[in-house]
A protein has these predicted regions:
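Non-transmembrane "mature" sequence context
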Residues: 1-150
Length: 150
């Protein structure tokens, strides 16, 4: 983990304040309603990114068994608050990638080694897996800064 990286510190503070309140996706009825659409979106994004299933499962915070059921359109469950947060971040990352890069690079970027200060040679997918939700927030914020031209 990169505890003193400014983006990680900012996201840690944001998560702490979210936990103090009910936070995103806290309502069970909302999670039940959103889960089917999120499952379809995750299935499509991970296919476009050509992410191995074990990595897709780790990013989404589900077991490989659950991910296989999602990929085969045979899952009727309900994502947890954590899993919906991960799905939301993944959707944001996907959208930002397609705003910044052409179709091919947008779908390859997640698996390419990145020498930038945030990633330090890691592939973004590896960074998100190793750093969890905080890492996913950092990737999304990084990409949003590219969209905005910073």
């Amino acid at each position: 983990m990169l505890p003193d990286h400014p983006e990680m510190l900012a996201h840690r503070d944001m998560l702490s304040s979210m936990r103090a309140s009910r936070g995103l996706f806290a309502d069970a009825a909302d999670r039940q309603r959103l889960s089917p659409a999120c499952a379809r979106a995750m299935r499509n994004i991970f296919r476009e990114w050509r992410v191995p299933r074990h990595q897709a499962a780790a990013v989404l915070g589900v077991s490989l068994y659950t991910l296989n059921r999602i990929q085969n359109d045979n899952w009727r469950g309900c994502f947890s608050q954590d899993q919906l947060t991960r799905a939301s971040l993944t959707l944001g990352i996907y959208g930002s990638l397609h705003s910044v890069f052409d179709q091919v690079l947008a779908d390859q970027w997640i698996g390419l080694a990145n020498s930038g200060p945030l990633f330090r040679g890691k592939r973004p997918i590896e960074f998100m897996i190793s750093e969890g939700i905080l890492g996913m927030y950092s990737v999304r914020r990084h990409l949003e800064s590219l969209v905005q031209g910073y």
